[in-house]
Amino acid sequence: MNYCNDHVRRRDRLLDEARALELLQQAEYGVLSMIDEEGAPYGIPINHIWDGASCIYIHCAPEGKKLRALAKHSQVSLCIVGRVHLLPSKFTTEYESVILRGTAHIDLSEEERRHALHLLLEKLCPDDLELGKVYVEKSFHRTAIIRID
């Protein structure tokens, strides 16, 4: 994954790369945007995990609008928002965000899918890993994984 801010107009408001990666790792959710089967914009909130190196993983049901859209149009955008600070007296809002563009992959190996689910467990329920592993095994057949590169 490359850190690129060439298109940002307000350079004074950029997150540095370290904070952007921290936000990517720690944020509770993001909004995945894509083009649906009919060519219309479609955005949906998702849980995600960054693998720490090169990709983002997202889990979902093994069928539905999101997967149908990605099968037809694999280019996506993921927006993650961190801290938000309203400044009413200045008529503005300070917030931090990371916006990624990438290609979604939906036909992943069983091994990669299991790896992604374990990364998600470590992030989303670190205090219940053993129970989470049991849940992953029970629900593996009904869980799809999307990788964004």
Annotate each language-model stretch with its function.
Residues 51, 61, 81, 105-107, ...:
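Solvent-exposed residues in well-ordered beta-strands and their adjoining turns
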Residues 24, 69-70, 120, 148:
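A generic structural signal for nonpolar/aromatic side chains embedded in well-ordered alpha-helices
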Residues 2-12, 85-149:
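Charged, gly/pro-rich active-site loop segments
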Residues 28, 44, 52-54, 72-76, ...:
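A generic structural signal for short beta-strands and their flanking turns/coil linkers
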Residues 27-62, 78-79:
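Short beta-strand segments
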Residues 3-31:
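Short, basic/aromatic recognition patches
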Residues 66-71, 77-89, 93:
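Helix-adjacent hinge/juxtasegments
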Residues 12-13, 21, 56, 65-68, ...:
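Anion-coordinating catalytic cores for phosphoryl-, nucleotidyl-, and glycosidic chemistry
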